[in-house]
Amino acid sequence: MEDKESLKLQVLTASRQLFMSKGYENVGMREIVAAVGQQPTQVYRLKLSKSDILAELILDLNNKQIAQLPKVLSKIKDGSILEKIVKYIEIQYKFDIENIELRKVGAVHGWSWSAKYESKNFEQILKLMQPIAQWMNEEGLDDVNSRCVGIFSLYYVGFRGAVINNFSAAECLAAIKPSLIYFVK
């Protein structure tokens, strides 16, 4: 089992490098197999399609983002609910901009993931939205889940600025802040 996990890690590492250097669309499974120096049957036994590999990479990136939450939240102690959410979103934008190439590929090709991966991705999104939900509950706001879905959607509207126009985290935030206000009233 350890060999299988080791091979999976090698496949994911090689795939990320190939996707980032050549583009997701330009990389095939044969190239991934060659990059890890294994026989095709060994890699195919992992039962990972190219879209599964991408999903695994995105889930790993999300886990890294989630692991940073205690550190992130330690920086957000005071302020109004809007100020806390703004600071939190700006920090998340910085993380996503640091990882923009992989985020771009995930946004374009995430539609091809299986329901299993989409479910895991959604669970991670809920974990990332938890601090905002907590602040809203503490503030006594109603319909917190719907507000969080709205903020998550708005987040990606702002992130498009980074993807398309090379916006900084502050510029992404400035693009959505006027609309963000409506979710905390």
Enumerate the language-model features and the residues they cover:
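Short secondary-structure transition hinges
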Residues: 93-133, 163-164
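Amphipathic alpha-helical packing segments from all-alpha helical-bundle domains
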Residues: 66, 70, 113-140, 145-149, ...
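Amphipathic C-terminal alpha-helical segment
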Residues: 94-98, 134, 141-144, 151-171, ...
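N-terminal intrinsically disordered/low-complexity leader segments
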Residues: 1-6
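Helix-turn-helix
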Residues: 10, 14, 18-52, 56
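Hydrophobic alpha-helical connector segments
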Residues: 56, 60, 70-98
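Solvent-exposed, amphipathic alpha-helical segments
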Residues: 10, 14-21, 64, 68-75, ...
